[in-house]
Amino acid sequence: MKSIDPRHYDVIVSPVVTEKATMASEHNKVVFKVLSGATKPQIKEAVEKLFDVKVKSVNTLVRKGKSKSFRGTFGTQSDVKRAVVTLEEGHRIDVTTGL
C-alpha cells in the first residue's frame, strides 16, 4: 500500500457539488474547496496522491464571503478558496454520484 502524507487530507477540504461544477466534470475538471493557504503545487500533489490520478493543471479562485443579516445584526461569511483541477485524458474522479 502506498503511503499518503496526512497533510494531503488537510489541503483538500471537500468537493464542490454545484450545477456549474457538475457541468465542468464533463470536460475532465473537478472543483474542490481547499485550504485558504494552499498553493497550486500542494493542491496538485494532494489530488494526485489521494485519488491516484494525473493532474494536467490547477486553477484557483477565492469566493468572497457574503454579507448576511441574523436577528438584526450584520455579519460576513468567511471567504472560501476553490481549486478547479483539470485531469489528464483517461483519468476521472466522480464526486457527483455516491454522495
UniProtKB/Swiss-Prot annotation:
GO cellular component annotations, sorted alphabetically? ribonucleoprotein complex; ribosome
Is the Disulfide bond keyword given for this protein?
no
Would the keyword Ribosomal protein turn up in this protein's UniProt record?
yes
What keywords are assigned to this protein? Ribonucleoprotein, Ribosomal protein, RNA-binding, rRNA-binding
Q: Which Pfam families match?
A: Ribosomal_L23
Gene Ontology MF terms: rRNA binding; structural constituent of ribosome
The subunit structure is: Part of the 50S ribosomal subunit. Contacts protein L29, and trigger factor when it is bound to the ribosome.
| Physiological role | One of the early assembly proteins it binds 23S rRNA. One of the proteins that surrounds the polypeptide exit tunnel on the outside of the ribosome. Forms the main docking site for trigger factor binding to the ribosome.
Q: What family is reported?
A: Belongs to the universal ribosomal protein uL23 family.
The name under which this protein is listed is Large ribosomal subunit protein uL23
Recorded name of the encoding gene: rplW
